[in-house]
Amino acid sequence: MLIKKYLTKSYIKDVIILMLGSAILAFGLYHIHTQSNVTEGGVLGLTLLLQEWLHISPAISSLVMNAICYYIGWKTMGIKFIVYSGISGAAFSGFYAIFEQFPPIWASIGEYPLVAAIAGALFVGVGIGICVRVGGATCGDDALVMSISKVTKVEIQWIYLISDLTVLGLSLTYIPLRRILYSLLTVVLSGQIIGWIAKEK
């Protein structure tokens, strides 16, 4: 009965959209973020911060924080949210693993940090925005942001901005200011793009 409930045209369309968004996100993170060392806010940035401050492996901290965020998302958004998030998260991992099998399109993009920051924001913003629009979260911080936005009625891009600014500000304890500024540009732009796509009709 549960399978029959979800196997509808609307559900299949949503799954295709989730996979598309996850593919775009994975492409951007592999070909731009990884090659340029642009850092992030949210859970990813916080795991790097905890590794620097407390020597806690991101493998452990990300698992714990994502589990907490998804639990909050489940309690706030319901079971459909968890199903969609599971699909988008698995699709992201799959697509990223595929992209890793090929050389980066522009391996020297790190030499052009401004280009990397803007391009990275576009791929992250569009990829996550598409997933959020149909009700899925590719990672824990998206789940937390969506939950906070639903409860507080504050637009999603401003929740992203506040959380990312907080993490990036704390990251100044171990990352040079110049690199943080480029990362700030990325998270501000991507957050605005996510918010625009998520509410666009």
Locate each region found by the language model:
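Core subunits and conserved enzymes of cellular information-processing
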Residues: 2-201
